[in-house]
Structure formats: C-alpha cells, structure tokens
Regions:
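Conserved PLP-enzyme active-site core in the AAT-like
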Residues: 1-39, 99-103, 112, 116-117, ...
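Short acidic-aromatic active-site loops that bind/stabilize oxyanions
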Residues: 85, 202, 262-274, 293, ...
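Conserved N-terminal alpha-helix of the aminotransferase class I/II PLP-enzyme fold
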Residues: 208, 253-294, 299
C-alpha cells in the first residue's frame, strides 16, 4: 500500500455524461487501410483545448497503476478472480463464526471482506489493542468501542490463527487452532452478481507465466521508451528513472506500509518525508511544504485553496479573480475555476513574454478583487520572463498573491528559485523535475511549497485532527513515490542538480 499510494481508482458513468468525464479516453478506430487502430478519443475537454472549462483537473492519470491492475485481471481471468474472491470471503465467514463463538458479535449485515465486532461489556477495545500490538497486528478501532478487520488475498491460515488468538486471549477462552478454512458464503441471493464479467478475449487467454510474459512484450514493442530513444514531451523535462532510485520501491518496508498505521510504526517513512520536505524548501526558497497533492493540477488546486484561506483570514475573502497569461498551461485556468475563482487573461507577445502594459492595466482594473497571478516560470514557450521580479511587485501592490507554476522548475534548480523572484506559492512536479516515473500518465506527485505567511493554511488531514484544505484521502499523497525523489536529490547533490 506504499503508506498511502500511488494507486488507481475507477468510475463509470452513463453515456449522456461522457463528455464531462475527466481524463483522456482511448478509443478504437480504423486507419485509411481499414485496419483496427487505437487513438485518443473524447479529449476535447482537456485543458489545452477547453482551458477554464476543462474537467480533467479533478483527477490525475494513474496509467501505470491501472496497467498493473489490468495485467492482474488478465493473468487471473474471470475464474481466477472469482476463486480469489471466494477464498477471501470464506476466511471472513470463518472468522465471523469463530469469533462470535468466543462471545463477540459481528454486526455487519452484509459483507464481503470486512468485519466489525461489538465487544462484550467485560472486554475493552484497549485490551484487544494491547494484545494485537504484542502480536504485531493492527486492527481498526471504532469510536463506539467496536473492533474491525479486513481480509484480503494475503491473509493466510497463520494470520487467521493469530486473529483468533487475539480475541480468545482477551475473552479468557480456549480456542482451537485452525488448519484450513472451508469454502463458505454469507452473501444473500439478492446481492450476488448475475451478469457476466471479464468477457473480452484478452482476459481469457494468458494464464501462464510464459503466455503473460510474451503478451506484455508484444505490447512493449509498440511503445517508445528510454530503451529506444529520448522521449519528446514538450517543455516538461523528464529524468531517467535510475535503478538506484527505483530500488526502494521493491522493499517490503516501503511497499507494505498501511497509511493509517500508528505513527510509531512509520518512523522511517516520517523521517524520509521530513527530510525531503526540508530539501524542497531549500530548493524553492520557501518556508513550508505539503506533499499531499497527487499531481501538478492537484498542486495548483491546493495552492489556490491555500491562497483563498489566507485571504479570508485577513478579511479579503471577496477577492475572487485570478490573472493568467495567455501563454499559461491550460491547467492554470482550469484549476482556478475548480477552486472557485474567475479568470482574467493577460496578453503575451509573439515570443511568449507577458505583455507588461496589459498586465499593469488588468491588475489595476481588477485590483480590488484580484486574488492572485498564476504564472509559469520559465513559460511553456521556454521563456524566462526578464521582468518577473517587477511582475511579482505589481501583483503584490494590488494586495494579491503570486502563484508560480513549477512545471518547468528543472530550468531553475540551483540557479534561482520561486522565493527569490518574489512568488508566494508554487507546485512542483516530482515526475518531471525530480525523477519519479511518469508511467505513460502517472503516478504523479505535485507538492506545494509556500512562503512563511501561507504555512498555517497548508493542507491538513483528519488523521492529524485538522482537515482544513485537505485535497487527498491520504495524509502524504502518493508517499510510495517519495523515496525516488529523495534518492535522486541526495545522490545528485547541489552541484549535480544545478548542472
């Protein structure tokens, strides 16, 4: 679980809503020879086309994780998936029956893999917790005193017996060690699936290691990668995902950490997160960092939420306009709208430079309602705005903040930084500037860095008792990716990063 991700998520919608879906959709078509081909479909709502009307900023592509999940389904097929599910549910049924016999009561009326036990009056959740921790087991403890657990594919007979022993010891009861779990089901008839699933040919062909390996290789041959050549991806500089950086991801200590484990069980992760945050503060010249946003677009949204919270705290919550140069990446206006602002476009010249006269005019015209300027530095044209310090001064004179889009931060590292030029907040794309993989679209990490006055408004999390400005279900976003960036920064050092 990588201490909270990355992971893929899915949703489906009715046909009439498909043009409002975020993200890109790949569809099949025919080429001029009549052969089957695949192409980008339904991308007209993307930021580079619809800009402030785009819907794709609410999510980030997780193509790498979705591909892994897809291969899992391909390898196991419909029968394999069902067999795994039946085993998981059978273990849950066995635990329900066995623990109920010890004097507890399982209270979930319908369940697949998740159980919740009400405790007898003579047993407290703290007793259960103490025994469980002594056996290196984490359970869920509800506010009303109930205790919960979830079963999955990794739960084996040893784990089953450990769970039984915890509840038996707390109850002072003898228990019989299980040697096997019988197949069983508690799912009611009306809840059982009647429709077919995984009917496509691809889910019914590749069920041996060799077949699967060859199938993956055939797909691999159709893609361009660093194994073939450099990859042209516009102004977003990507880095080599070196083996030394990727190695930690295969270590169980990083892979198997649940995001909600007690803090004293995640001291290594917390130290890494703290150290990386300090490095990013130095690189950006800022005072605070949040690693919670899961993409650059999510970082923009989070940064704008921080600005809004700050303005509200000083009685300037009426400010609702964001000034954005015409050359800006489409995520900027899309994020501004998602965060509840309206956008004002500032002109650029033929070379992509901000038109200073138009900037001054638009800033003056909207100064009473101006919340921020969003500017990419260097711009998507590859231009370092020579007037960037003056631009920041103009915006600050209006009582507004400066949001620097860090998509092209690679060109700044070690030479200058957002804090030095006068910006108030920026996001970073760790999958661009700091070597984490892009995976054909994900997993991304888009931390935000802020000046001192904005630190109190960084995204919180309910886990820490402060959910203000929370933008992710996980407290540290895709924490499993962070060892890559930390390794890259530490191995490169100041000189290497600058060069």
């Amino acid at each position: 679980m990588f201490y909270s991700g990355p992971s893929a998520a899915y949703f489906a919608t009715r046909d009439e809503y498909k043009r409002n879906m975020p993200g890109r959709i790949i569809g099949w078509s025919k080429d001029k020879y009549g052969k089957l081909c695949y192409r980008m479909a339904l991308q007209t709502r993307e930021q580079h086309i619809k800009r402030e009307k785009a819907t794709s900023n609410i999510c980030t592509a997780q193509a790498l994780l979705a591909t892994m999940a897809g291969f899992y389904a391909v390898y196991h097929g419909p029968e394999g998936i069902r067999t795994i599910a039946e085993r998981i549910h059978s273990i849950a049924v066995f635990l329900e029956e066995s623990i109920n016999r010890l004097g507890y009561k399982q209270v979930n009326a319908q369940y697949f893999d998740t159980l919740r036990f009400a405790l007898p009056d003579t047993i407290s959740a703290q007793q259960i917790r103490t025994i469980a921790l002594s056996k290196e087991v984490n359970l869920r403890y509800f506010k009303n005193g109930d205790v919960g657990m979830s079963i999955d594919e990794t739960t084996d007979i040893t784990a089953v017996n450990v769970l039984l022993s915890i509840f038996a010891i707390a109850a002072g009861r003898d228990w019989e060690k299980a040697s096997d779990v019988p197949m069983a089901s508690s799912i009611s008839a009306e809840m059982k699936r009647q429709s077919t699933y995984l009917t496509h040919e691809v889910f019914n062909k590749y069920h041996t290691e060799t077949e699967m390996m060859r199938y993956i290789k055939r797909l691999n041959r159709k893609d361009i990668s660093l194994a073939h050549s450099m990859i042209s991806l516009g102004s977003c500089t990507m880095k080599l995902n070196a083996a030394a950086e990727m190695l930690p991801l295969s270590r169980p200590e990083f892979m198997n950490m649940h995001p909600l484990v007690p803090e004293d069980q995640a001291e290594g992760y917390r130290e890494l997160i703290s150290n990386l945050s300090e490095e990013l503060k130095i690189i950006t010249g800022f005072a605070g960092v949040s690693l919670q946003p899961n993409s650059g677009a999510a970082g923009e949204y989070a940064g704008l939420r921080v600005i809004r919270a700050y303005l509200e705290s000083i009685g300037q919550g009426h400010r609702n306009k964001i000034l954005i140069p015409a050359s800006a990446h489409g995520t900027n206006p899309a994020s501004a709208i998602q965060a509840g602002f309206t956008t004002v476009t500032c002109a650029c010249d033929a070379q992509g430079n901000v038109d200073m006269a138009d900037l001054r005019a638009k800033a003056e015209e909207n100064k009473d309602d101006l919340a921020a300027l969003m500017i990419t530095y260097p711009s998507t044209h590859g231009i370092f705005e020579t007037e960037i310090v003056e631009i920041c001064h103009i915006i600050h004179a209006c009582g507004a903040q400066v949001y620097m889009d860090g998509a092209n931060m690679n060109a700044q590292v070690g030479l200058t930084n957002p804090g030095f030029i006068g910006a108030d907040v920026c996001h970073l794309n760790l999958h661009k500037t700091f070597a984490s993989p892009h995976g054909g679209g994900g997993p991304g990490v888009g931390p935000i860095c802020v000046a001192e006055h904005l630190v109190p408004f960084l995204p919180g999390h309910k886990l820490f008792g402060n959910a203000a400005n929370q933008v992710s279900g996980a407290p540290f976003g895709s924490a499993g990716i962070l060892p890559i960036t930390y390794g890259y920064i530490r191995m490169m050092g100041t000189e290497g990063l600058t060069r």
